[in-house]
Amino acid sequence: MFDKINKTLDFNQNLLNLYAKRQEILSSNIANADTPNYKAMDINFKDEMDKITKKSNLDITLTKTSSHHLNPRKKNFFIFEVKPITSKEIQSNGNTVDMNRERIEFIKNTLKYEENLVFIKNEIKNIMNVLKG
């Protein structure tokens, strides 16, 4: 039972990390909308989601270089592949940021992040109710 709970929470934690990283990328694109030659970036959400589902990157281990370092209990490390967005519209200064796309993706990503937080909150609430009896 606890293994299933742990897997559910780990999956959702990794999903939150993915949404947070994407939010950083989208924010950077918006902030650099007027920067000459800036290339808009993003992650392929489906590919990164597949990595989380398959847990292919969870085997990364840390090396202790000091006896004062803590031993990691969880392997929750993902290396997200950030790629330039192929844009149909390139500004005269070489910038490829499409503000309409960035705003829409930013809002969608924010809503998905919040939705996942609510899901985790409800899962924890349900677990607490079961434990209380």
UniProtKB/Swiss-Prot annotation:
Output the InterPro entries linked to this UniProt entry: Flag_bb_rod_N, FlgB
Intracellular or extracellular location(s): Bacterial flagellum basal body
Keyword field contains Ubl conjugation: no
Q: Which GO terms describe its cellular component?
A: bacterial-type flagellum basal body, rod
Lineage: superkingdom: Bacteria
**Principal place where this protein is found?**
other
Keyword entries, A-Z: Bacterial flagellum
Task: Name a biological process GO annotation.
Answer: bacterial-type flagellum-dependent cell motility
Which spans of this chain does the record mark as coiled coil? none
The answer to keyword Repeat applying to this record is no
Function field: Structural component of flagellum, the bacterial motility apparatus. Part of the rod structure of flagellar basal body.
Describe, as the record does, how this protein assembles with itself and its partners.
The basal body constitutes a major portion of the flagellar organelle and consists of a number of rings mounted on a central rod. In Gram-negative bacteria, at least four rings, L, P, S and M are present, whereas Gram-positive bacteria lack the L and P rings. The rod consists of about 26 subunits of FlgG in the distal portion, and FlgB, FlgC and FlgF build up the proximal portion of the rod with about 6 subunits each.
Family membership, please give it: Belongs to the flagella basal body rod proteins family.
Name of the protein in its database record: Flagellar basal body rod protein FlgB
- According to its UniProt entry, this protein's organism is Buchnera aphidicola subsp. Schizaphis graminum (strain Sg)
Q: Which gene encodes it?
A: flgB
